[in-house]
Amino acid sequence: MSVLVIGGSGFIGTRLCLRFSRYGKSFQIIDKARSEFFPEVVLRGDVREPLALNFSLEPTVFINLAAEHRDDVRPLSLYHEVNVDGARNVCDLARAKNVNKIIFTSSVAIYGFAPLGTNESGIIAPFNDYGRTKWEAEQVYKQWQSEDTKNRTLVIVRPTVVFGERNRGNVFNLLRQIASGNFLMVGDGLNRKSMAYVENVAALLEYSLDFKPGIHIYNYIDKPDCTMNVLVAHVNKLLGRSSEIKFRLPFSLGLLIGSSFDLVAKITGKKFPISAIRVKKFCANSVYESAIESTGFIPPVPLMEAIEKTVRFEFIEDHKNEQVFYSE
């Protein structure tokens, strides 16, 4: 088996390829960016364009991790070009190379403002272009699989927010605030957040290489979901501080402060780490469920251990000159 990892120079792709390298799996990467870890196996390519490439090893599986998902993507048409047109180009390449297995990372963003406990059968109601184009990309892959249902395998993984060492997304920003000692808890802290550790996501993608023909769709969440109180206390304890949260800001006051920063930002053009939407996101519940256990998959790293690994790497050990990934 030879795997082509499309978008393999990124955060999840790098972690996945490290697993492949560790366990002796053959792989190549297509990416518009150079891989700091595996430059020797990278083929430069952009999923927005037809992928006519010469491979040193003919792939038997495609894993597509390429995506546009930052909140500030401009022009907005990039979401469609990368997520939807990119899916079409991947499927065209699969047809040309007679590849019968595609693994695609979608997102729980397709559910939009989902009810607590939304699973794979949840209502599709994306509220932004990222979620909408991820859903549209899923339909492109389903069409490809429907052309030869007896032989083609499609795996769609919908992770919640992915965190881990080297990532500079929303979870890192929260951990950095806590580590700075300037973190202020807003609200009662009882709200829960579903999260996914990058090593576990990579392990699931690797595990799904053995799935049989058909369509396999799974949310991915590391359980159990922890409350903000538990998360903040755990991080403080790891940093050698008291786990007690001594002061809390009422949600209404936190929202007022966030709105004030929004006004100042609008007037001055400056960006601030506090905003009304960030206060709302922090205090909101975001809980998803998954049927992944039915496959027999067991995540290699428990959630609390994953948080510990991330905190140690980012705020205790010295990795300041190493590569990081900006994803959100």
Question: Model-found features: residue ranges?
Answer:
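N-terminal Rossmann NAD(P)H-binding glycine-rich loop of SDR-like oxidoreductase domains
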Residues: 3-23
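NAD(P)H-binding glycine-rich loop region in Rossmannoid oxidoreductase-like domains
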Residues: 46-85, 89, 93, 111
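Glycine-rich NAD(P)-binding loop of the Rossmann-fold in SDR/ketoreductase-type enzymes
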Residues: 78-89, 124, 132-135, 196
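Conserved Rossmann-fold NAD(P)-dependent oxidoreductase catalytic core, especially the SDR/UDP-sugar
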Residues: 89-129
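Flexible, glycine-rich beta-alpha linker
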Residues: 111-112, 152-172
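Active-site Tyr-X1-5-Lys
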Residues: 128-155
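Substrate-positioning beta->alpha
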Residues: 167-173, 187-209, 216, 230
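Mid/C-terminal beta-alpha module of Rossmann-like enzyme folds, strongest
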Residues: 208-273, 301-328
